[in-house]
Amino acid sequence: MKSLKLPPRRAVLPLVRMALREDVGRGDRTAAALAPERGRMRARIVAKARGVVAGLPVAALVFRELDPRVRFHALVRDGATVRPAMPVAEVTGPPRTLLTGERTALNFLQRMSGIATAARALVDRVRGTRARVYDTRKTAPGFRLLDKYAVRAGGAENHRMGLDDAFLVKNNHFTTARAMRLDFAGAVRRARAAARGVPLEVEVR
């Protein structure tokens, strides 16, 4: 599998902070009442099903954003295949922090691992052929960088990151092009002339 590079921290951290604000709000009442603020606790993140892991660095960032004293030790790498009951990470830190960050960290990890697992299943289906599996822009708003990273963790490939990456002429574009008195070939020529050197694709069904 190709080497994986997580999106820049400056792009991921706002998502982590948003997720923590959403979940923690004014504070974790249960953990504040029932978990000590100091001391050390070790927890393990364990796979519940066979699949492909993705998002471990993001999960680590969740805990460290809550408390820099937390130590996150990944036992596998993103892109690894895991089986049920297999430990994937160990987290050590104050009990209250671990309980507060648990759900947010797992939400990132489960979502990204689910995408990676689905991508791997499709890649496996075309293995041995010349076909390649690409993603789309149909991602959760704001989460495109992480969703597309998870696709790569599963062994598939990224298509356009955004509308400015390339031309992708689809049926809707041909519909609007007809209003400009352009046929199929004319629409393609016009798009190509608009920005030479930019990749151009035509969707077929």
Q: Whereabouts are the PLM-identified features?
A:
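Acidic/glycine-rich phosphate/pyrophosphate-binding loops and surrounding catalytic core
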Residues: 2-205
